[in-house]
Amino acid sequence: RHKDFWQITEDSLDKSMQAFNINKAMKNELLDLYKILSPYPEVKETLEKLKEKRYKLAILSNGTPALLNELVKSNGLQNLFDDIFSIEEVKIYKPSSKVYDMPVKKYSIKNEEVAFLSANTWDVSGGGNYGFTSIWVNRNKNIFDNLDYKPKNEISGLNQLIDIL
């Protein structure tokens, strides 16, 4: 049975609040924090430069369409993305190939033509194993998890993407 990301987040929060004896009245306040995430300082400028170079920009996320659209709009980024792909279209989470198929099919492109960025090592590995050109956004100089895949590139900020592409 499929549950969307928001429901899983709520369920996990309920269990965590119970385990740590956190007042249930705080639940909505804590959930609302997901809706006010802000991008890093260089993100908007980098996306604008990529759009000027005519790159197609998209989000591919386990998040729900409602949450993703709200975050993009609240940060003034809605005109910078060509698409927002949510796993809700296929009702299965990454790293299922059905998720990664979405942009490949929509744009009729080869897997390796997709530059797939993430700060999560498991996410980079999933996209890379699918055949995407994976780029790990490693802002904190972390060590890549011991997974069966290593990213094609590693950057510490999105602005470095301009030189890679």
Language model features with spans:
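Catalytic-core regions built around general acid/base machinery
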Residues: 42-54
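Asp-based, Mg2+/Mn2+-dependent phosphohydrolase catalytic module
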Residues: 24, 48, 60, 64-65, ...
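Transmembrane alpha-helical core positions of polytopic small-molecule transporters
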Residues: 36-37, 93
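Surface-exposed cleft-lining segments at the edges of enzyme active sites
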Residues: 28-36
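Short phosphate-binding/catalytic loops that engage adenosine nucleotides
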Residues: 54-55, 132
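A metal-dependent, Asp-based hydrolase signature
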Residues: 1-28
